[in-house]
Each structure stands twice: as C-alpha cells, then as structure tokens.
C-alpha cells in the first residue's frame, strides 16, 4: 500500500491557507470571525503558517451544545473559525484525494460527488435485481463517533500517511477530546476512514454485492433471510475485534416490499420510492410557513426552501404531494417576489 510523504509543507503554504479560508468561509461571510480574517487576510494567513511551521498550534476549546437531529439529541462540538476551522480545510485540501481513493464506491457520507442522491440512484439500480434483493439487513453502530478508538484511528491514518509532521497535526486534533467530535470538518472523514476496513471486508472477503453505508448506517440486500442474520453476527464480531465498536441492538432483517428500506431520507421498494415521513412533514411545514409569512422572509430563503425539497422529491414517487402543496398560491408568491426583485424564478421553471 502506497504511503504519502512530503505533504506538510503543502498544507502550510500561503496559497493553500488562502484556499482553505475561501472554502471555510462559504455561507459564513457575515460571521464576526470571518469578517476579522477578511479585514486583513495576509496577517492571519501568516499567523496560521507560523503555528503550523513551528508546531505551536494547539486545538482550541470546543463550544459544546445540544442539537435535535432528525428526532435525536446530539452533542455538537464547535471550534473557532480562526485558526481551527481554517486549518481543518488546509489539511483536507491536500489529503482528501488520498483518503477518498481508499473508500469503496458505495459509501456516501459527506464526500464530494457522492452525495445522498448518488446513493439513491445506486440503491434503485440494485433493486432492479429483484431476486437478489428480496431481504434487507439494516443496522447501525452504537454511539459511533464517541466510541471511535484513537489508537485504532491513528493506525488507520498511518497506513496512508507517512509524513511525521502531518501525523503530529492530525494527532493534535484527534486527542483534543474523547472519541471523534460531531461538528468538526475532519470528523466526517475520520468516520469514513474508520469503517473503511469493514467496507472492504464485506465487499471483497464476504462478497456482499449489495452493501451500502452512509456514516454508520448500513444496508445489505440479499435473497436469503438466514444468510443476512448470519452476516449480522459476523459484522458484530468484526466490529468488536477490529474496531472496538458495537452494533446497536435495533438491527432488522425484513422483506423489502413489506416494509421498504428506510435509508438516505427515503423508503425504497422494488417498484417505487417514497420520501421518509419526517422529510415530507418538514416540506409541508415549510410550505405553510411560506404562505403565512412570505412578506417577512428573504426571497432567497423562500426560493431555496421550495427548491431544496424539489431536489428531494424528484427522486421519489410523490407527484401528488408536490402538486398539492406547490399550488397556485405558492407559484404566485414565487412569481411576485421574483418580478419585484428582478431575479429569475426557479419555481416557475420547474412547476410552470
């Protein structure tokens, strides 16, 4: 396996730091810390360069808060924009291509060019093979991010990274808290890399033709229910021995067409695909909010709110839901604000 060296100097180059700031500030240009860096970028870029070059960088303290994510309360860890979040982007600018090449095709969490809807297309394609996809094993890992073992994660990173200076920086970030903190830009990649050996073992050693993973949510499709039950035992053993992880006890083996595969925000059946109930509910709530308060909302928020759900619905069989809620009034609101502000009307382009 090829190991990469001489990466660290690329990470702390001023050109890379400038690119990292450009990427990290997207959607955040009104934040006070971003404005601070924007006011004198070269000053702050040079500070980061010195921190990295002289190895004086120390991970900042986290701001920890609770957020409700799809009905689950999660502890979210937030770092300051300067220097931490810029430094995370500095690292990823250089190592992302190296890490992504090690991942299987059917993992979809937070990877460029492999979003949720890439996974949706792959699952739909798999379900065309009806005989081999009669049953589904669905499972996830118990407290995945908090349970990631630092020593194991470091060994995984060392398999691809030879550069001792870069490993020092990665270790500084990894050891800043227990497990891997949800909210860090690097964390989503650490999570993917941590489970990558499981992915390859399932695909290559266990010959799982239809295996899909999003973060720690996993789906395997097969023609034999008993085969999937045995596979679940093998996976639990692999996770325990190799990664010091446990499967949640809520794993399920079920017929695909009886219940549908609840995955990636959809419910998949052989002949059709539905939006997950929670997604449909949020869409309805958003449309009601727009109708009630559209005069006080920013036009961009109204249009992006409608079009983001259209992006979800175009992959599902939910035409009646769309045309019930994207009605004459919503089309009129979109047309009114676009004519008033002299901007194009994406809702009109899609719905007429």
Regions found by a protein language model. Give the residues of each.
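Active-site-proximal segment of RNA-dependent polymerases
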Residues: 2-7, 14, 92-149
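Short, conserved non-catalytic motifs in the polymerase core
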Residues: 27-36, 60-86, 102-114, 172-192
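Active-site-flanking structural segment that lines cofactor/substrate pockets
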Residues: 41-73
């Amino acid at each position: 396996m090829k190991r990469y060296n001489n990466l660290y100097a690329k990470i702390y180059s001023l050109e890379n730091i400038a690119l990292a700031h450009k990427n990290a500030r997207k959607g955040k240009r009104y934040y006070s810390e971003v404005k601070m860096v924007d006011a004198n970028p070269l000053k702050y870029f040079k500070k980061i360069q010195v921190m990295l070059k002289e190895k004086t960088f120390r991970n900042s303290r986290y701001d920890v808060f609770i957020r409700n994510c799809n009905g689950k309360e999660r502890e979210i860890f937030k770092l300051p924009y300067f220097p931490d979040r810029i430094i995370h982007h500095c690292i990823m600018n250089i190592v992302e291509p190296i890490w992504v090449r090690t991942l299987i095709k059917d993992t979809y969490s937070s990877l460029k060019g492999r979003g949720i809807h890439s996974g949706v297309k792959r699952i739909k394609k798999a379900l065309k093979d009806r005989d081999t996809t009669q049953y589904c094993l669905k499972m996830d890992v118990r407290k995945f991010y908090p349970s990631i073992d630092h020593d194991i994660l470091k060994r995984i990173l060392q398999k691809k990274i030879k550069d001792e200076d870069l490993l020092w920086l990665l270790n500084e970030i990894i050891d800043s808290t227990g497990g891997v903190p949800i909210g860090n830009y690097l964390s989503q990649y650490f999570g993917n890399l941590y489970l990558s050996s499981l992915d390859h073992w399932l695909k290559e050693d266990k010959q799982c033709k239809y295996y899909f993973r999003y973060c720690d949510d996993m789906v395997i499709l097969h023609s034999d229910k008993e085969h999937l039950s045995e596979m679940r035992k093998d996976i639990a053993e692999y996770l325990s021995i190799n990664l010091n992880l446990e499967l949640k006890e809520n794993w399920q083996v079920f017929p695909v067409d009886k219940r549908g595969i609840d995955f990636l925000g959809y419910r998949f059946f052989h002949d059709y695909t539905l939006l997950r109930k929670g997604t449909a509910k949020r869409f309805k709530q958003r449309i009601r909010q727009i109708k009630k308060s559209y005069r006080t909302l920013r036009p961009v928020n109204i249009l992006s709110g409608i079009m983001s759900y259209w992006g979800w619905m175009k992959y599902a069989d939910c035409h009646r839901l769309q045309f019930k809620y994207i009605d004459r009034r919503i089309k009129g609101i979109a047309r009114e604000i676009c004519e008033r502000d002299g901007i194009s009307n994406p809702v009109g382009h899609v719905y007429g």
